[in-house]
């Protein structure tokens, strides 16, 4: 079962799904930024679709851009940013509405090792502020570095579910 905010998500009604969706932020490997919008506008868009006030947007967007370290890029367009900066914009957009859960699908997949480490540090900061991070990755070095709960899935079956045991070696620590 999957439980978010004390609700079993597989039994939610169609009416309840949008409410739950507002509590989940999503970050993709390919950033999925809106190319004709600035950094500020990309992040603000996530608030606009929830009908947040312009005042709230003007206040919160700079705060989140500061948190992810790209305040100086607010008026740039996605094609003017490095891959790491684009991922920071995607993370800012995902967390602007204070989600309970952040789903990160290969958030370091298109990044060089140094930038990937910086993004992982940023996700760690977000987690320490109270957001649960669910990350999909094939980067075993990141799994080992983060030292968090690891759930490995192979061919649709959970083969590992551990916390506190690290070292991602082939054939080791799998469930029977």
What feature does the model see in each segment?
Residues 1-19:
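ABC ATPase NBD Q-loop/coupling interface
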Residues 37-44:
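Short coil-to-helix segment of the ABC ATPase nucleotide-binding domain corresponding to the Q-loop/switch region
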Residues 76-79, 97, 129:
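Conserved signature/switch motifs of ABC ATPase nucleotide-binding domains
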Residues 77-81, 85-87:
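Conserved ABC ATPase signature
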Residues 91:
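Hydrophobic anchor residue at the start of the ABC signature
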Residues 102-105:
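Catalytic Walker B motif of ABC-type/P-loop ATPase nucleotide-binding domains
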Residues 113-115:
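Helix N-cap at the start of a conserved alpha-helix in ABC-type nucleotide-binding domains
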């Amino acid at each position: 079962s999957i439980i978010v905010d004390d609700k079993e998500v597989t039994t939610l009604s169609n009416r309840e799904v949008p409410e739950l969706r507002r509590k989940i932020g999503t970050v993709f490997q390919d950033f999925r930024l809106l190319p004709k919008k600035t950094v500020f506008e990309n992040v603000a868009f996530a608030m606009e679709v929830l009908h947040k006030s312009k005042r709230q947007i003007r206040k919160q967007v700079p705060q989140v851009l500061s948190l992810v370290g790209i305040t100086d890029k607010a008026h740039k367009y996605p094609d003017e940013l490095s891959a790491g900066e684009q991922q920071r914009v995607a993370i800012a957009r995902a967390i602007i509405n204070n989600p309970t859960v952040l789903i990160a699908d290969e958030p370091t997949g298109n990044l060089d090792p140094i930038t990937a480490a910086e993004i992982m540090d940023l996700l760690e900061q977000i987690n320490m502020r109270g957001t649960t991070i669910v990350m999909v990755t094939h980067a075993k070095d990141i799994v080992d570095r983060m030292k968090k709960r690891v759930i490995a899935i192979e061919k649709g079956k959970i083969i590992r579910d551990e916390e506190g045991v690290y070292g991602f070696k082939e054939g080791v620590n799998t469930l029977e």
